[in-house]
Structures are given as C-alpha cells and as structure tokens.
A protein has these predicted regions:
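Extended, histidine- and acidic-residue-enriched regions that form the cofactor-binding/catalytic faces
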Residues: 1-105, 109-234
Length: 234
C-alpha cells in the first residue's frame, strides 16, 4: 500500500537497477554488482527526489551456460540467456507501468547488462506508446573509463587482480559493506594492499569509495534529466 499511496501522491519515477552474480576471486562477494547497483541507485534517487528504487535484478547474462563461456567458466556464477534477461526486464517494466509509474529507468552495474536493458526499454516504449509511460536505459551509470579517470586524477593507477577484482569496485564495496570484501580476513591473511593502495588506511579508502558512489550517482542523474527533456522515446 505504501507504493500505491506514493504513486497516487504523484511519485511516478522508478529506478530499476540490475547487478549480477559472478566470480570475483577469493575475497569479493559473488553479489558485488548487486550491492553496488543498489547503493548507487539509492543515492541517485535521493538526488533526483520523488523517485523510488525497485529491488535489484540480481541475475543477468554472464556467458553461455553449456558449453560455459565468460564468467560461467567459474563456480558461483549464475547466468541468464540474453532473451530471458530482456523478457524479465520487459515484464518488470510493464508491471511498474500498469501500476502507474510513467518513468521507468534501467541502470546496470555490469557490462553484460547493457544491451538487454536497452532492448527492454525500447520494447516497453513500443508496448505503452499510447500511454504517458516512458522507459529509459542509462549507459552513463556504468562508465568504466570515467572510474579510471577518477582514480588517475588522484594519482592512483588501476592494477586489476588476476582473479577479476578491480579497485574502483572494491572501493565502493568497502564503503558500502566491508564484509562483502572480506576486509578483516584479508588483513589477517596478510593481504594488506589492493591495487597498490594500503588496506590498512581504511578511512581513506572508504572516503574514496563514497566519492565514487557520489560521482556515479550524479552522472546518472544528469543523464536521466537529459533523457527527460527528449520528446522522443528512446
């Protein structure tokens, strides 16, 4: 009933974050992208105002299932077919539209999510073309070059670990929830550096993670505002 009342009160914009379940080496949570997608989306909603955030879509394309490719070569990964992912997003968007949301925004924290979100938004716009509903896909939410630039401006050069761990994402996790990075276990095991930075300077790393989350949220909000000004459906 809370959602119903908010919609009746004029709140008709909803963010739909997508994440993923994938291998990330011995320390990082399989749900890395889900934690980050939720945190950045919640901050973006705060900046936008009058915006709700739907539950994170946790399952996304991660490679062929059989024979396995991509992240599916590693245990713990869960993958969807591209057409399954697109259909899932379209049904989620349609459900939100039927209940009164007129602005449905897809945001994805992984490279494999992008095409499916773009196609789903297009299908929703086609399906609801006679209504006020519009769906948007925001690629600016996942802008890895921008993250690298952010680090470089602070004199930090990204050195990805051999087992698919990237500093920009680990910094966000440290700011969101240290256990998802197994922070204490790392220190106890003698792994006290990450991407050339000392994990012992925790406060500094948390501050960097919060800056990244804020930067991504602001970039996403800017992109959403720009899409809202477009007369055509994209």
């Amino acid at each position: 009933m809370d959602v119903r009342d908010r919609i009746r009160g004029g709140l008709t914009r909803v963010l739909v974050p997508t994440g993923g379940i994938e291998q990330n080496g011995p320390f990082v949570s399989l749900s890395k992208h889900n934690y980050i997608a939720r945190a950045v989306s919640l901050r973006a909603a705060e900046l936008l105002g009058s915006t709700l955030v739907a539950p994170v879509v946790p399952f996304v394309p991660q490679g062929n299932i059989k024979p396995p490719t991509g992240h599916m070569l590693f245990s713990g990964t869960i993958s969807l077919k591209e057409k399954t992912f697109e259909a899932l997003l379209e049904d989620i968007g349609a459900s939100l539209a039927v209940h009164g949301f007129t602005e449905i925004v897809f945001l994805g924290d992984s490279a494999g999510n992008q095409r499916g979100m773009q196609k789903a938004a297009a299908q929703i716009n086609k399906r609801f073309h006679q209504s006020p509903t519009r769906a948007f896909y925001i690629p600016e939410f996942y802008n890895y070059p921008e993250l690298r630039k952010f680090l470089a401006q602070r004199g930090i050069e990204e050195h990805p670990e051999d087992f698919h761990e990237e500093l920009a994402f680990s910094l966000q996790l440290l700011a969101i929830s240290p256990p998802t990075l197994r922070y204490e276990q790392r220190i106890a095991a003698g792994h006290t550096t990450l991407g050339g930075l000392s994990l012992l300077d925790r406060d500094k790393l948390v501050a960097l993670g919060k800056e990244i989350i804020e930067m991504r949220a602001q970039s996403s909000v800017k992109a959403i505002r720009e899409r809202e000004l477009m007369p055509e459906r994209k």
